Structure formats: structure tokens, C-alpha cells
């Protein structure tokens, strides 16, 4: 084979297959908070199926379980614990307001 063609050939490397995040024994239920909390972001949003690496059926069941837990108040709708901090305060003018025309 030509040297120029050899440079563009892809090497066939091995890849590690990831384990599914939900085991066969795990029960998807609104009471199983340890399982549900893995699929919620820090802000309290439900993570997408691509991020979770779930099947369509599992994602649907997780979504329903999260929504049931939110309705029964075992899970908050929003996570407001994160406080926003200002790094630098901007001084505000204290005098009368001026109009820009």
C-alpha cells in the first residue's frame, strides 16, 4: 500500500463498554430516592436521556417517578440552596437620575 494511504487509515482500538446506570434489581419508584437523585441535576432538573445513558422506557419511568416524588413533596421542584455570590460590587449613583437624549 502507498504511504499516503496508510496515513489516513484509522486504527481499530478497543473501547470499554459502560455499565447501565440502572441495574436489573433496581426498582424505579418515587420512593427510591437514592436512585432518583442520580438522574437530577444540581438545579433540580431532570437530566436528558443522552446524559443518563438510559433506554427510552427507563427514561419514561424515571421521569414519571421524579414527577410523582415532586408532587408528594419528597423532592423539591427547584433547588434553591445554591446562593449566587457577587465577586465585585458595582457602585450605584446616589444623586438625581439624569436622562440621556
Curated annotation (Swiss-Prot):
Entry's localization field: Plastid, Chloroplast
Gene Ontology CC: chloroplast; mitochondrial small ribosomal subunit
Record protein name field: Small ribosomal subunit protein bS18c
| NCBIfam families in the cross-refs | S18
Q: Does the keyword Membrane apply?
A: no
Question: Is Acetylation among this UniProt entry's keywords?
Answer: no
Instruction: Note the subunit structure.
Output: Part of the 30S ribosomal subunit.
The primary gene name is: rps18
Which PROSITE patterns does the UniProt record give?
RIBOSOMAL_S18
Comp. bias (Basic residues): 1-19
The record's annotation in InterPro entries points to: Ribosomal_bS18, Ribosomal_bS18_CS, Ribosomal_bS18_sf
Membrane-spanning segments: none
Region Disordered, as annotated, extends over 1-23
Q: Which GO terms describe its biological process?
A: translation
Query: What family does this belong to?
Result: Belongs to the bacterial ribosomal protein bS18 family.
Enumerate the GO terms in the molecular function aspect.
small ribosomal subunit rRNA binding; structural constituent of ribosome
Amino acid at each position: 500500500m502507498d504511504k499516503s494511504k496508510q496515513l489516513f487509515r484509522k486504527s481499530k482500538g478497543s473501547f470499554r463498554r459502560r455499565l447501565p446506570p440502572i441495574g436489573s434489581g433496581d426498582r424505579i419508584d418515587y420512593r427510591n430516592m437514592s436512585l432518583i437523585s442520580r438522574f437530577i441535576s444540581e438545579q433540580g432538573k431532570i437530566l436528558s436521556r443522552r446524559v443518563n445513558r438510559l433506554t427510552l422506557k427507563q427514561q419514561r419511568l424515571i421521569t414519571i417517578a421524579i414527577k410523582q416524588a415532586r408532587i408528594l413533596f419528597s423532592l423539591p421542584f427547584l433547588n434553591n440552596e445554591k446562593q449566587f455570590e457577587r465577586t465585585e460590587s458595582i457602585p450605584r449613583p446616589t444623586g438625581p437620575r439624569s436622562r440621556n437624549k
